[in-house]
Amino acid sequence: RCVSETAPGPGNPDQAGNCLKIVKDLFNKIPILGVCLGHQIIGQVFGAKIVNAKKLMHGKTSKILHNKIGIFKGLKNNLVGTRYHSLIIDRKTLNKDFIITAKTKDNVIMGIMHKNYNVHGVQFHPESISTKEGMKLIKNFLKYK
């Protein structure tokens, strides 16, 4: 089983080198988990606009509300996620082939999942020590079919 993780920033998807091309070329061939900038890259590849967040979130934590599906299955709701970003996926432009799997209380998209392919994105950092359930989320991705 092959796994790809598009790494976090800095910058925006247009400055991400070959990451846009990698997602375009491989989304239907291998599982992809996009973290932070990787999440935004997935959104942009599928037509979403990436916009400035109303609030900068560099090194801050937020409670993440999720729908307990996909890579969030079995995780506590209101999990604390560590955030390092100033850009977000514009909810109105998210491709309808994606499900919003997680958000903040102020409705910022924190997780997406493609309906037909093993493609997931999270705006927060599951690998951060401050994201207590982060390793469970990553394990869920590794096991997800």
Please give the residue ranges for each predicted region.
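Histidine-centered divalent metal-coordination motifs
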Residues: 36, 85, 125
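Short, small-residue-biased leader/transition segments that mark boundaries at the very start
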Residues: 1-3
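Glycine-rich nucleotide phosphate-binding loop and flanking beta-alpha elements
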Residues: 11-12, 90, 130
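Conserved hydrophobic/aromatic beta-strand scaffold that supports enzyme active sites
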Residues: 61-63, 109-111, 121
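Acyltransferase
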Residues: 129-145
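Catalytic beta-strand/loop cores that center a nucleophilic Ser/Cys/Thr
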Residues: 70-116
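Cysteine-nucleophile active-site neighborhood
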Residues: 6-74, 78-80, 138-139
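Active-site-proximal beta-strand elements of phosphoester/diester hydrolases
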Residues: 81, 119-124
